[in-house]
Amino acid sequence: MKRNNMCPFCYIRNLLVGAKKVAAVPEIEKYETGVRRTPLMGWSSWNTFRNHIDEDLILETAEAMKEKGLLDAGYSYVNLDDCWQSNVRDENGDLQGDLATFPSGIKPLVEKINAMGFKLGLYSSNGTLTCEDLPASLGRERQDAQTLAEWGVEYFKYDFCHNVPLSSYAPLIWAVTVTEKGEKQGQRYLCSNAVLEGLARFMPDKGLEGKRYVSGLDAGKGKMVFKNVFARKSGDYVLTLNIKKHGRYPKFVIAEVNGTPYEINFPDQKHFQHTARFQTVVRLEEGNNEIKLYNPVASGKDSAILQYRKMAYALKAATKNVAEKRNAPEKPILFSICEWGFRKPWLWGDTAGNMWRTTPDIRPIWPWIKLIYARNVKLFERSSAGHFNDPDMLEVGNGKLSYDRNMSHFALWCFMNAPLVLGNDVRKMPDNVLEIITNKSLININQDELCKQAKRVKKGRVDVLAKPLAGGRTAVLFFNKSGVKKKIS
């Protein structure tokens, strides 16, 4: 960890014994859009078709799903995974479909899919590029969310390839300035007006107004609080952070204004000048306001939480904006977090999305499917209505899985309250696969209105799962993992 101009004693203390974290990622309520209470049911292109998708394939798949009764069974989403998009954005910087494989554009495709009774879903990554190195959405959250909403997209999978984590370092702040939006002159508050917490310290610098700045706000270990920031009236104000330049590395800070967090990123800086300023627009109330400045990013998990929340709330704002602009009903977007379970999204996913991957990618290989089950089944307490553990898409009908293994795979996903996202070629599937994925009893268990994930009540060669259902009922599943017939008593 770099010192970042932290007071020498504080830096040594932090290295040797650590310091108490005084600024955590803000606690917020569950992410709610009203999109659906029960797990998603649909189809996705990735497991079978990978990067070989086009407009005709998607329309043929939707037609086959309707003809074979999958829409009636509940599979209402048709989702395009990676490689739907062009490698170049349009002249406005917006995402666009592949110019050759989706020549009609995405909005007309959405309209055709909707006309069949389905909803269309798309994919991007919480990074600079997608997993297949196409344009992604990190840093363009509001713009891309607006594009999705205007197209009428109703599901969005957000991967984690090419992610650039938020910096754990904070800038060196010597003052904040608050200016009523549209006005030239604002009120400056020198850092000496702030109350410091944790490792935050005043450091001397004769070249600055006020002769000092605050360091030690890094990695959640420090905080500075301005308790009496005055606003003449309630409204939008420009908050300017005046900083001392230091270090050739990015920095990050949250400005929490009356409990509402605003994020500010600071790029790697050249040192031609001693100081710099960075701004955001905040909401102030008439009279005195409180502004807290801190960097809560102490880990990759902290960074991921903030980045996924940013896209989640951009989607929520975009669908509302489009509905108001068109004077039409809102089409909320079901938001799928896909960071592969490495940063324990089951602990925070319900504040940032509707479903979250708990494992790396699935494969149509039986031992791998059992490993995914073994990890996901333990997380039963983290699933609730509108918020689900996602052990990845179904491989039923793919690879060389036997009928019994396909049935076991589907039944386990139903009991674990998992999203049921088909990954096979539904145009060509055999009748026995169709029989499995339209099993009404299992689908009813998955879609039960109580929305409880099954608990493994017995572990062994035969696992026993119990899933609470509405009306005081319980569904029980016996999963024979041994590979040989077992007598159950």
Spell out what each predicted region is:
Residues 7-55, 313-320:
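N-terminal module-boundary/linker segments of secreted carbohydrate-active enzymes
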Residues 21-31, 103-107, 138-146, 277, ...:
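Alpha-helical scaffolding within the catalytic cores
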Residues 57, 61-168:
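Aromatic-lined carbohydrate-binding/catalytic grooves of carbohydrate-active enzymes
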Residues 302-309, 313-425, 456-458:
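Glycan-recognition surfaces
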